[in-house]
Amino acid sequence: MLGGSSDAGLATAAARGQVETVRQLLEAGADPNALNRFGRRPIQVMMMGSAQVAELLLLHGAEPNCADPATLTRPVHDAAREGFLDTLVVLHRAGARLDVCDAWGRLPVDLAEEQGHRDIARYLHAATGD
């Protein structure tokens, strides 16, 4: 773990969806679970539409089940709400739980349905056996 600016740079690169920068920082030893100044990890602030960023972070040890300290949302909640099936699948295959509620009692499937993301809702129902 390098700490400091490398870890902060990783969160920024993940948020911007900068795949090559994320790869370089991780290969240089940046901590995929380092908290930013808001108490969030790179996998929580990553550009949800970038399944490649998710894969890189997870490959280097990012925790797929980390919860937001205020809302209890996890990356799967964000991917389901925003409509990013590819990212959701990557997270799920890496061990992300689909059966955990956020602070308002909503599951990822609830968020997908609220937003009209039928393909994601179908995937989540199939994955959870509902």
Curated annotation (Swiss-Prot):
Q: Which residues carry this modification: Phosphothreonine?
A: 12
Record's note on what induces expression: By TGF-beta.
Can you quote a single GO CC term? cytoplasm
Q: Does the keyword Lipoprotein apply?
A: no
Q: Which SUPFAM superfamilies does the protein's record reference?
A: Ankyrin repeat
Q: Which residues cross the membrane?
A: none
Q: In which tissues is it expressed?
A: Expressed ubiquitously.
What keyword terms does UniProt attach to this protein? ANK repeat, Cell cycle, Phosphoprotein, Repeat, Tumor suppressor
Single GO biological process annotation from the record: cellular response to nutrient
Q: Has the keyword Transcription been applied to this entry?
A: no
What InterPro entries does this protein's entry cite? Ank_Repeat/CDKN_Inhibitor, Ankyrin_rpt, Ankyrin_rpt-contain_sf
Q: Where are the ANK repeats?
A: 5-34, 38-66, 71-100, 104-130
Gene Ontology terms, MF aspect: cyclin-dependent protein serine/threonine kinase inhibitor activity; protein kinase binding
What's the subunit arrangement here?
Heterodimer of CDKN2B with CDK4 or CDK6.
Give the family from UniProt: Belongs to the CDKN2 cyclin-dependent kinase inhibitor family.
Question: What task does this protein carry out?
Answer: Interacts strongly with CDK4 and CDK6. Potent inhibitor. Potential effector of TGF-beta induced cell cycle arrest.
* Entries under PANTHER family matching the protein: ANK_REP_REGION DOMAIN-CONTAINING PROTEIN, CYCLIN-DEPENDENT KINASE 4 INHIBITOR B
Name this polypeptide is given: Cyclin-dependent kinase 4 inhibitor B
Q: Which organism is it from?
A: Mus musculus (Mouse)
Q: Which gene encodes it?
A: Cdkn2b
